[in-house]
């Protein structure tokens, strides 16, 4: 059983709950060991599948399913190879696991056979109201208070950590987990000027319901991905890659992981799955990170184009941070998820929304266009103002359309003018 928990101890409070309720022996017998401490299944850290199973899925391109009681059922979230995820209550998770398939009506079909060879139905194993009440009665707040009274004590390994005695964090150049981020490199300089975006290239042309997990995955790091290559170059073995979520303190890993979800579909490559794109100057297929670095090297600004509900899912700050570090100046979509839109503004990335019935399909965008965003230079930035998008196609023809700038509030205007909310806050502190 994997369940979300913020701290890890040898004897976890929820272990105590299960044991006090008398559930642990029965769960152990069924193979449901309590192993998922911290952010596990809901963030993609539930571990690998057995190798023969992984090979079978990949070789036959199987669409396999999971059943979980967490709060995330995005494609590939529980495991990159698991495309379909069903949310259910914990008892139903156990029931479906016993059945071994989701292609069953568990209200009427048996889950399996008992030792006596007779069919076992969900109604046979479902607890009564009294059984539930009796189990809950064994759990009390004293157990919670007892465990959390020692929340900062930690185990022997925690106590053995050597901490440098310094007023500020001592950065370690060889660390692959925490690196000095570049977000404040130019904080001592003047405020950045808000200017038009000229000659931008499309980094990715995406569809509807692109989640923050598509943008910045939190799960396993593939060995042949840009992040995997970076870690190997640093001497990290693939077995020790850990996950994007665990390495979120290292921007070098996280920017390489941006748009690296194996289930993302870039329409510039015909909608094939994987974090790749078409590098327009040469026509090469490259990892999105590699293409972005080439564009940065020659000073080419970048734009991401998407459909409806861009940025749904977890309010993952790295989905906006990574977008910024790749050199993306604007995201143009049909609609945005509220928090991610705000996070883009907070990282100095311009969220623009198509108007009326216009979208990437009606405009026949291929991703090979050059884009200009006009109306920023020499203009007082105001919430939800209109800007002009100039689309220059491969044949040199141009089309101008109006887009809505989704900087929605006066506070967001100030954040954007400062280069993002991090710069805004730090400049305010310096000024005071």
Listing of model-derived features with the role each one plays in the protein:
Residues 1-9, 13:
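Single conserved hydrophobic/aromatic residue that forms the stacking wall/gate
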Residues 15-16, 33-147, 345-350, 381-384:
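Mobile "lid/hinge" segments at catalytic clefts and subdomain interfaces of large enzymes
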Residues 71, 293, 297-337:
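Extracellular/luminal Protease-associated
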Residues 84-85, 90-92, 215-239, 321-330, ...:
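Extended active-site and interfacial segments that coordinate phosphate-rich ligands
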Residues 114-129, 341-415:
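Acidic, glycine-rich flexible loop/linker segments
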Residues 120-204, 213-215:
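Flexible inter-domain linker/hinge segments
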Residues 177-189, 198-297:
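N-terminal beta-alpha supersecondary unit
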């Amino acid at each position: 059983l994997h369940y979300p928990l913020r701290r890890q101890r040898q004897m976890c409070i929820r272990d105590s709950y299960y044991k006090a309720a008398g559930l642990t022996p029965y769960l152990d017998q069924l193979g449901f060991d309590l192993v998922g401490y911290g952010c596990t299944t809901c963030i993609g850290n539930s571990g690998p599948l057995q190798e023969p199973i992984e090979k079978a899925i990949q070789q036959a391109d199987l669409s396999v399913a999971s059943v979980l009681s967490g709060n995330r059922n995005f494609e590939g979230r529980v495991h990159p190879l698991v495309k379909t995820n069903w949310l259910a209550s914990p008892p139903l998770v156990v029931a479906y696991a016993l059945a071994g398939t989701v292609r069953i009506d568990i209200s009427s079909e048996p889950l399996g056979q008992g030792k006596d060879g007779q069919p076992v139905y969900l109604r046979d194993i479902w607890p009564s109201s009294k059984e539930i009440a009796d189990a809950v009665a064994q759990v009390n707040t004293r157990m919670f208070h007892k465990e959390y009274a020692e929340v900062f004590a930690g185990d022997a390994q925690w106590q053995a950590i050597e901490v440098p005695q310094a007023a500020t964090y001592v950065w370690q150049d060889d660390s692959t987990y925490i690196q000095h981020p570049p977000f404040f490199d130019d904080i001592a300089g003047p405020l950045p000027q808000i200017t038009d975006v000229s000659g931008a290239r499309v980094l990715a042309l995406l569809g509807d319901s692109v989640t923050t997990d598509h943008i910045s995955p939190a799960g396993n790091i593939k060995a042949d991905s840009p992040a995997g290559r970076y870690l190997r170059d640093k001497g990290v073995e693939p077995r020790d890659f850990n996950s994007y979520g665990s390495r979120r303190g290292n921007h070098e890993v996280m920017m390489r992981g941006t748009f690296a979800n194996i289930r993302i579909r870039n329409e510039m490559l015909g909608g094939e799955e994987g974090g790749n794109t078409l590098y327009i100057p040469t026509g090469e297929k490259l990892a999105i990170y590699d293409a972005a670095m080439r564009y940065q090297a020659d000073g080419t600004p970048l734009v991401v184009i998407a459909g409806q509900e861009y940025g749904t899912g977890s309010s993952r700050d790295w989905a906006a941070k990574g977008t910024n570090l790749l050199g993306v100046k604007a995201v143009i979509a049909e609609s945005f998820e509220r928090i991610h839109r705000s996070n883009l503004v907070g990282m100095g990335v311009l969220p623009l929304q198509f108007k009326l019935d216009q979208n990437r399909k009606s405009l026949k965008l291929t991703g090979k266009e050059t884009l200009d965003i006009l109306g920023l230079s020499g203009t007082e930035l105001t919430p939800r103002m209109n800007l002009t998008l100039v689309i220059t196609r491969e044949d040199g023809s141009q089309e101008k359309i109006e887009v809505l700038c989704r900087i929605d509030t006066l506070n967001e205007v100030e954040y954007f003018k400062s280069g993002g909310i991090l710069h805004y806050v730090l400049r305010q502190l310096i000024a005071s």
